[in-house]
Amino acid sequence: SHMEIKVNFLDKLRLEAKFDDFTVIADQPIRYKGDGSAPGPFDYFLASSALCAAYFVKLYCETRNIPTDNIRLSQNNIVDPENRYQQIFKIQVELPVDISAKDRQGMLRSIDRCTVKKVVQAGPEFVIEEVENLDADAQALLTHNAATNAFTFIAGKDLPLEQTIAN
């Protein structure tokens, strides 16, 4: 299932992402010349894996009628001082004493199935390109218009995707 997110440039460094019926606002902290009026894009990225983990715990509990009132979940990202793109996402869950060992294991295993985590671990490929018309291009994407002769450049690779496959 594919989702298009359209971004609008607002005042100063504020941005607005629109998808489905939702709008998300991002800003930058004051130290980065923003107003600090909203989380930054990377903050949303970090929040997405914590929320995904909690969602999978919630699903596990719902199907087994386990109350989530006293379950607490937290995520910390530990950044490698040598390489800030090398990070450990540590997800910690605090569970009430009355939860069985079986359910404790089950909850940890369900967090492991989190979609955000799985996509990040698989290492998504980013295709960055200019288009003449976003709306027309989105339409072509939906109808899988394979009749285009456009070359798709993947950042970090020299040859267009089509030629890389051909080689």
Question: How would you name each of these model-derived features?
Answer:
Residues 52-53:
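Alpha-helical metal-binding/catalytic segments enriched in His/Glu/Asp
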Residues 2-47, 58-167:
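Extended beta-strand/beta-hairpin segments
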